Amino acid sequence: MNVIPTAIEGVLILEPRVFGDDRGYFFESFSAASFREQVCSTDFVQDNESFSRYGVVRGLHYQLPPYAQSKLVRVVRGSVLDVAVDIRRGSKTFGQHVAVELSERNHRQLFI
């Protein structure tokens, strides 16, 4: 897995190693050991999936302590432009944003 930092601390682009041939492809979308070694120690407690029709804009979602949680976002079909905005008061990147294309072709994931 290749880990790419973004302009916002704690927001990372993850690029898995994809193994493909004429049958299709395979990649490890998550490994607790690799994640702990390259990103941070985390316990994922929830897994969600959503479907959006073409042209849909999803809202900005966030949680405040004590309900804050990290998210690992990926796309299995099509593509999205995922935008993360730093709304943490006191953060040196407060108000800044990063935009990342996530798609079935690039297999990128965004850790927020």
Where are these regions (language model features)?
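Non-catalytic, conserved peripheral segments adjacent to functional cores
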Residues: 1-108
